Every structure is written in C-alpha cells, then in structure tokens.
Amino acid sequence: MPSPPTPLTANNSPDKMSGVYGRTFWLAYLANSTLILGNALTFRFAELVNHLGGTESDTGIIVALGTAVAVLVRLSVSHVLDDYGTRRMWPLCAMLFVVGCASFLVPTDLSWVIYVARVAYFVGLTGMFACSMTHIQNHVPPERRTEIIGNLGSSGFVGMIVGSNIGDLVLRLVPDKRTQFVILFGGAAAIGLVYLVIVILLTRDQPHPRTASSPPAFRLLFRFWPGAVVLAAMIMGLGVTATQTFLTRFATSQHIDGIAAFFSGYAISAFVFRLLVSNWSRTIGRHWMLVRGLLGHVVGHALLAFATEWWHFIPASIVCGFGHALLFPAVVSLGSGAFPKECRGSGTAIILGFTDFGSLVFAPVLGWIIVHHGFTAMYLTSSGAALVTACAYAVVAWNHPDEEAARSTARTPDVNKHGTDRGYQPVEK
C-alpha cells in the first residue's frame, strides 16, 4: 500500500506548484490534448488496410515497417533534438505527421504508398511526443519530473475520448467506406495543423543556447544504459499495438458496435488514477509504480480476450487505464533520467524508441497470431508477455530502491557527477 501523501515541503509548496504549472505547462497540455485527438482518429488504420484489400497480417507488417524507420530515426538523429532544440525540431515533426495523415487518402489499393504514409505519420508522431516530453522536463526540477510527465499525459485522455467516439460516429452514420476514411484521416491532418500552430506559439520565445554537439544515440545508450526499464518500455509498445491497432478489427470480428466504449473508459480511468497516484513516485517509488502498471496490462488484456459484447470492454478499459496511468510516467522518467540533462532530449527519444521497438517486434507477431489462431490467443499472448515482464521487474524494484522517493523525503536533490537521475543507476561503459 502507498504511504500517506507527502507533507507540504519546499518541493511542493504553493509557490513551487505555481511555478511548475504556469503558461508553459498549460500550452503544452493543450497541445498534447490536440495531438491525441488527431491520433485517435487514426485508430481505424487496420480497417483502412482491410478496405484496401489487406489482412491483419498485412497491417502488422505495415505497422512494423513504420516503427522500424521511426526507431532508426530516433537512434541516428536523436542528438539533433539536443543540438537544435525543440523550437526547431517540434514543428518539423508536426508537419511530417500532417503529410503522413493526408497521404493515407492517396492509395486506392494496398500499394507502396500506404507504407510510405505510415512511415511519415509514425516518425512525425513519435518525434512530437519526444519533443513534448523533453520540453516539459526541462522546465521542472528533477524531483518533479515523474509528476509533471504524468500530469501532462493526462491531457491526452480527453482527446482519446472525443477522437474514438468521433470514429465510431463516422462509421455508424457514413455508409461509404471511402468517405469514412477521408473524414477520419483528413480530420487527423487538419488537427495536426492546429497542433502545429500551438507548438509555434509555445516555443517562439524559447532560447536554445548552443553547446557542444551531443554524442550519437548509440554511444549515449552504451554509456548511460537505462537498465531493465527498457523491457517495460517494449511492453508499452506491445500494449499500444494490441489496442490502438488491432482492437478495431477485433470489435468487427465479434460484431461489437465500435471501440469508443473501450477508449472512453480507458481515458477516464487513466485520468482519474493519474490524479490519485500523482505522488506515488515520491512515496512508493517509480519501480513499484512500473510493476503495478504492468500488472494492469496483464489483467486488462486477459479481459479483452473474452469480450463478446460492447460492455465487456468497460472493465478491461478501466484496468488498462490504471496500468497506463502508472506505466507511462514511470518509464519515461526512469529511462530519460539515466541521461545527463544536456542529453535529456536524446534520452527521452531513446526510451520512447524502445516503446517503438516493442511495437516493431510484436506487431507482425500479433498479426500472425490473429490470422492463424484468432484474437483471443493474441490478447492472451500480450497479457502473458506483460506478466513475465512484471515478475522480472519486481526483482529490480526489490533490489534497487528508487531515489526519487528518497530525495523527496530528504528534501534535497541527489544527482551523480553527470547530473543524471539515480533512481536506477546507469551503467557507464
């Protein structure tokens, strides 16, 4: 059980709170909500592939290709984010997202165009998330990073609810398949343009003093290896693929009317739990947050495996939302915190890259399982993978107490000579 809320200290006093939750935070909050709204409209991507003549296995391969390119981009040019700053890189990623969403409307059959469009869309999307997380982390003290990442992430839940319900409404009211996808993916591109404007407003006065060029991502990764948290990041990628990519086809196969019930319940649950557990990183620590988040995915995906009615999505969504509320901020904070502050952009991109790598590894596997053994086997597989990872990471949590909680208790920062977070000490090589 978590310990009682941390008493009011210099680190969470009203003055400190007002400094953290100022104009920068709320503009970033609006931007992230807009991004998730646009992305939620693309949850019907598997339906688009099916409309173009593809199967779930084809969907898995397309998703894996887009993810593979995104991972390569992260690892090869992630240092550019530190060198040039979010003010330059963030708008570029947003424009790539817009181009990708618009390009989904070009092909009339399953051609190379859909592969290129998926690459552009996903590279842009992952870059936008990396810029957003890097930007907000650089505006708060180290001991508040997990809290601020979690609270910023809560902004996306409104967008997820609205976007998934719009998707269901479009499919229900618009009979023509082609028109459905024009509305969904064209709408995502238009929302991406709105996001671009918000990002420009958010970063236009942001200075970025040039320092020595950051080392390449591979060198940083070997020097400041984040540890076992990369396994949890990969399971996050598995969870994203199992729900955001394949749930729509699962609902269709089960003759369930839409996926809005799942994503609405998921978003509401994650938002509520994110508020309820916002101080857990400073009480039970991020390692145990991560274990509990993984267990949420274990139960949630197991429940999805046996869903036959729309309301069966609700209990699964609540448990999955709980898992996401804990897992995402803990993974990003632990992973990026292993890197020095001057390399925080690269560190954030790298740990999110392991999430993408999880999608890359598991998307074709899940697609193959669906084609040969069905959706029930696929969701039981994803649940089992999360369970194995949770058990393995529990050993880490038991043997490596999180020093973010220790710092909060001591009321003094505790960083090593590189300025990195010592919640799980990186390995220097």
Identify the residue ranges that each predicted region occupies.
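Juxtamembrane intracellular "pre-TM" segments in multi-pass secondary transporters
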Residues: 7-21, 203-231, 413-419, 423-424
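Helix-loop boundary and gating motifs at the non-cytosolic
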Residues: 18-67, 229-232, 240-250
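Residue-level signature of mid-helix packing/kink "hotspots" within the transmembrane helices
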Residues: 40, 67-75, 160-161, 267-275, ...
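Helix-to-loop junctions at the C-terminal end of transmembrane segments
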Residues: 73-85, 273-285, 370-371
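C-terminal ends and interior cores of transmembrane alpha-helices
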Residues: 95-109, 296-308
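Cytoplasmic helix-loop-helix junction between adjacent transmembrane helices
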Residues: 119-155
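C-terminal membrane-cytosol helix-exit motif in multi-pass small-molecule transporters
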Residues: 168, 189-209, 392-397
